[in-house]
Swiss-Prot record:
One of its GO terms (cellular component) is Golgi apparatus. This is Multiple coagulation factor deficiency protein 2 homolog. Ca(2+) 1 binds at D80, D82, N84, E91. Residues 1-26 form the signal peptide. One of its GO terms (molecular function) is calcium ion binding. One of its GO terms (biological process) is protein transport. PANTHER family: MULTIPLE COAGULATION FACTOR DEFICIENCY PROTEIN 2 (PTHR23104:SF14), MULTIPLE COAGULATION FACTOR DEFICIENCY PROTEIN 2 NEURAL STEM CELL DERIVED NEURONAL SURVIVAL PROTEIN (PTHR23104).
């Protein structure tokens, strides 16, 4: 259970990081979860270098000219694969597993399906304030505060 909470924080962080760094392009980068026991990890979302990697070729604005809020928005959009301005369980799953792979070493244990489901359920429970089964941008931004 503690492992799930630790992975949840990195998922949310990755999401925040993508939104906060210019030059990040839509890519399969995950989000960190960290919000109390479950949620977005602010440090990952604010990792400008990683976000810029993903926005390269997508955003022409220099990273120095982007506000943290602009970076957060780009990070969010980067993980919104279907373009509906909402993050669903599958999009959260992709973000989480991407972060798990990047942060772990080659010997990092594979996350089980049950662990992944538990993390996603925790993110939705803690951050989906209107209980619609999705994380919208307002909920995403609020979870990073």
């Amino acid at each position: 259970m503690a492992t799930l909470q630790l992975l949840r924080a990195p998922l949310l962080c990755v999401l925040l990081w993508v939104f906060c760094a210019p030059g990040a392009r839509a890519h399969d980068h995950g989000a960190d979860v960290h919000h109390g026991s479950v949620g977005l990890d602010k440090s990952t979302v604010h990792d400008q270098e990683h976000i810029m990697e993903h926005l390269e070729g997508v955003i022409d604005q220099p990273e120095a000219e982007m506000s943290p809020q602009e970076l957060q928005l780009h990070y969010f959009k980067m993980h919104d694969y279907d373009g509906n301005s909402l993050l669903d369980g599958l999009e959260l799953s992709i973000a989480i597993t991407h972060v798990h792979k990047e942060e772990g070493s080659e010997q990092a244990p594979v996350m089980s399906e049950d662990e992944l489901v538990s993390i996603i359920d925790g993110v939705l429970r803690d951050d989906d304030k209107n209980n619609d089964g999705y994380i919208d941008y307002a909920e995403f931004a609020k979870s990073l505060q």
